[in-house]
A protein has these predicted regions:
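Conserved nucleotide-sensing/catalytic segment adjacent to the nucleotide-binding pocket
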Residues: 102-140
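P-loop (Walker A) phosphate-binding loop of NTP-binding proteins
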Residues: 69
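N-terminal pre-Walker A segment at the start of P-loop NTPase domains
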Residues: 33-51
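Hydrophobic anchor at the beta1->P-loop junction of P-loop NTPases
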Residues: 64-66
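Short beta-strand-centered segment that lines the nucleotide-binding/catalytic pocket of NTP-utilizing
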Residues: 87-102
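Conserved lysine of the Walker
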Residues: 74
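Short phosphate-coordinating micro-motif centered on Lys-Gly-acidic
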Residues: 37, 129-187
């Protein structure tokens, strides 16, 4: 059974006031609990602030699975995230290289674009398994790697509505939930 533990909505009918609404979904006693937080970005600068907040709480071993349609903002979010953690000025989308790596202050940062993969097995050739343990991973089009994607990750669904960009972030453990709650965006 799925029960909504908490939902915050603005009283004038607008969903997700200012920056975030917190939604906790409990999937029963024997199942993993998911925690969701939704962030609203009106400008590219808002997206930059949000990406920087996430990069500030990122830890070695974190995987950010970035879902969204073409043009949703996956590469833009990734660029700001990477620039905040490294000296990289230019952060091109890895559309053709499939992966770009960057030396961060405390760990390596891997930026994947899986759009062109034909099967999950092709991700092995990119060294994806090693990167899961050796750094922070930003994965665009994670649905292309299917079963290779670990369970305990940051799931980021990006979508647009009424000229705003929304980032729906889901985590499934207490430690990530604490980091999500301390993010500092829109507080």
């Amino acid at each position: 059974t799925l029960s909504v533990a908490a939902t915050i909505l603005q009283s004038n009918g607008q969903l997700f006031p200012k920056a975030a609404a917190f939604l906790i979904l409990a999937h029963g006693l024997n199942k993993m609990t998911e925690y969701k937080k939704i962030f609203k970005c009106l400008t590219e600068n808002d997206t930059k602030k949000l990406a920087c907040c996430f990069s500030n709480v990122a830890q070695k071993g974190d995987i950010f699975a970035l879902y969204g349609t073409l043009g949703a903002g996956k590469s833009t979010f990734s660029r700001f995230f990477i620039q905040n953690l490294s000296d990289a000025q230019e952060v091109p989308s890895p559309t053709f290289t499939l992966v770009q790596s960057y030396e961060g202050n405390d760990f390596e940062i891997y930026h994947y674009d899986m759009y062109r993969l034909k099967s999950p097995e092709e991700a092995y050739e990119l060294g994806i398994e090693e990167s899961f343990y050796n750094g922070v991973n930003l994965i665009e089009w994670p649905e292309k790697i299917g079963y290779l994607l670990p369970k305990n990750i940051w799931t980021v669904n990006i979508f647009t509505k009424d000229s705003a960009r929304y980032f729906e972030v889901t985590v499934s453990d207490e430690e990530k939930k604490e980091r999500l709650e301390k993010l500092g965006y829109g507080d």
